[in-house]
Amino acid sequence: MHMNKLKILMLGPSESGKTTIANYLSESINIEEAGPPRPTQGVRIVEFELPNINVNGKNTNIDIELWDCSGDHRFESCWPALRVGVQGAILVCSPTTTQVATRELELLYNYFVSQPKLSAKQCVLFYNCTNDSDDIESLTLSSTFSKVSQVAINLKSGGNRLKIDFSNYITSVLQAINRYA
């Protein structure tokens, strides 16, 4: 079974750590090498292969096209183009962005998940914890997110856990796509 690339958008407020997560998942950096956040201009596409994903009982390799999208609203005019052919959305926020995050995530979810008619299974929320005392419970989201998986991630202490969470997420995207294919 061979599939085309999976187009996954990574979205969220500026400085929530999207690029670091994208780089880590695609294995282009070690976390120790991650410098201070630099704003992404528009979008950056990271392509990599995710091995051994279980699809309908068979292990397969999936090509991922991870679109690391800027959180800067200057680039909002690009949103319609970003949304074309989207198969999944990863929303990212961090303790430093929780004040703006609630409204921002709602807007992004509406535009990139609800409007293109993705299911909640095709979306995941990564709460990017920068230290161990950060708690996902401090994130108060609307009922819109009641069906969306919300995962606290900590790259410094739990990078491998993030890879597992990401693989699980990709599996749920594939299941959702196959159901509607």
Describe each region flagged by the PLM.
Residues 1-181:
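TRAFAC-class small GTPase G-domain
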